[in-house]
C-alpha cells in the first residue's frame, strides 16, 4: 500500500488533520500507528480504505487507487473500525451475507477463532456486549483471509483475557502466513 501526498480536513475553514502525508506499507507485516487523540490516526485509516476522500493525494492498494472502490480491491482488505454497529441477526446470517465478498473466506478459520474467544457460532449479534461484538468482528475479519487487515483500536472494549486472546490469535494468524 502506498500513500502519496495525502491531505485531509473535515472542514475547509479548519486546519487540515493530515497534511502531505506519504508512506509505504508492506504486505505481511504488522504496523502500529501511534499518536495523541485527535491527530488523525483513524482518519488516515479511513482514507487508506477509501471511506474518506482526501483533499489532495491518494492511497493505492496493489497499485489501484482505493477511491475507485473496485471489487477486486475491496475484497483484499478488511477494516475493523473503533466504533461500529452490527445488524440484529445471528452470526451465521452475517457470514452468509458478507463472506461471499471475500473470495478466500475460510469458514474453518472462523470457527477456530470463535472457539478461542469462547463465542458460539449461533450468537445473535444484536444481543452482544461491545466487547463480544468486537471479538465476533475480529473473528470474521481474520477469516476473510484478506491481504490487508486494518484495525482501529482493536482491543478497545475487550477485557484483559480478551486482549490476551487477541494477541495470541494475531500471532497464530501471522505464523500461518496470511
Residue ranges and their predicted role:
Residues 1-20, 27:
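A short, flexible loop at the N-terminus of ABC-type nucleotide-binding domains that lies
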Residues 31-36:
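The feature captures the beta-strand-to-loop junction immediately N-terminal to the Walker
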Residues 49:
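Helix-to-loop junction immediately C-terminal to a conserved catalytic motif
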Residues 57-68, 72-73:
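Conserved ABC transporter NBD signature motif
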Residues 79-136:
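ABC-family P-loop ATPase nucleotide-binding domains
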Residues 149-153, 158:
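Catalytic Walker B motif of ABC-type/P-loop ATPase nucleotide-binding domains
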Residues 163-176:
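Helical segment within the ABC ATPase nucleotide-binding domain
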Amino acid at each position: 500500500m502506498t500513500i502519496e501526498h495525502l491531505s485531509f480536513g473535515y472542514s475547509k475553514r479548519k486546519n487540515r488533520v493530515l497534511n502531505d502525508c506519504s508512506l509505504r506499507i508492506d504486505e505481511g507485516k504488522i504496523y502500529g500507528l501511534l499518536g495523541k487523540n485527535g491527530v488523525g490516526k483513524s482518519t488516515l485509516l479511513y482514507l487508506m480504505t477509501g471511506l474518506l476522500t482526501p483533499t489532495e493525494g491518494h492511497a493505492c492498494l496493489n497499485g489501484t487507487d482505493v477511491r475507485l472502490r473496485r471489487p477486486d480491491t475491496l475484497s483484499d482488505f478488511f477494516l475493523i473500525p473503533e466504533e461500529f454497529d452490527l445488524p440484529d441477526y445471528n452470526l451465521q446470517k452475517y457470514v452468509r451475507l458478507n463472506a461471499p465478498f471475500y473470495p478466500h473466506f475460510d469458514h474453518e478459520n472462523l470457527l477456530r477463532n470463535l472457539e478461542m474467544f469462547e463465542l458460539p457460532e449461533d450468537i445473535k449479534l444484536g444481543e452482544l456486549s461491545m466487547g463480544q461484538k468486537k471479538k465476533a468482528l475480529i473473528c470474521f475479519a481474520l477469516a476473510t483471509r484478506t491481504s490487508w487487515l486494518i484495525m482501529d483500536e482493536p482491543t478497545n472494549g475487550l477485557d484483559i483475557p480478551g486482549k490476551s486472546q487477541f494477541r495470541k490469535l494475531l500471532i497464530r494468524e501471522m505464523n500461518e502466513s496470511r
